[in-house]
């Protein structure tokens, strides 16, 4: 499905960083939609255990190039699989509770998905503590 949106500068940097991590080539010929789909699938099994507030607070520490002023926001159309888009929509609803807000925009959800995937790839993903510890 094709979705039109404006991605923020940190999201654009995250896309570049994730591409570098996955393909070791920042000029790899893959679409932004494909990378968002890869990121979503990489964290899909952990969605309910991820500490989204911690990821949101750590955004500036996730990428090396965050302060690169040559990178600006991006108006783009993402081609996403239906399952990925459905997952993003479910996260939008979940994030309204997590961040105690009445409205949640897709670009913000996509940004957090990318940052969570980058943190997972670098073994720095913060998961919520298990509520039922069997000790």
Predicted regions and their residues:
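Short, recurring structural edge motifs at helix starts
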Residues: 23, 95-99
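Extended aliphatic helical segments
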Residues: 12-13, 30, 36, 62, ...
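Conserved aromatic-histidine-acidic binding/catalytic patches
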Residues: 3, 28, 76, 98-102
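Compact DNA/chromatin-associated regulatory and scaffold domains in nuclear/nucleoid proteins
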Residues: 79-82, 86, 93-94, 107-116, ...
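Structural motif corresponding to the C-terminal cap of alpha-helices
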Residues: 92-96, 121
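Short Lys/Arg-rich basic patches
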Residues: 1-20, 56-92, 134-135
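Short, basic amphipathic alpha-helical segments that act as recognition/interaction helices
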Residues: 27-54, 101-128
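N-terminal interaction modules that seed assembly of large macromolecular complexes
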Residues: 1-47
């Amino acid at each position: 499905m094709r979705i039109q949106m404006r991605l923020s500068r940190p999201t654009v940097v995250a896309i570049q960083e994730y591409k570098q991590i996955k393909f070791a080539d920042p000029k790899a010929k893959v679409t932004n939609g494909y990378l968002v789909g890869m990121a979503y699938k990489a964290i899909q099994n952990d969605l309910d255990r991820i500490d989204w507030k911690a990821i949101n607070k750590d955004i500036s520490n996730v990428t090396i190039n965050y302060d690169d002023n040559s990178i600006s926001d991006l108006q783009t159309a993402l081609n996403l699989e239906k399952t990925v888009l459905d997952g993003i929509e479910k996260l939008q609803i979940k994030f309204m509770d997590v961040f105690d807000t009445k409205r949640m925009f897709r670009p913000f959800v996509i940004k957090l998905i990318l940052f969570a995937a980058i943190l997972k790839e670098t073994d720095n993903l913060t998961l919520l503590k298990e509520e039922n510890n069997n000790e």
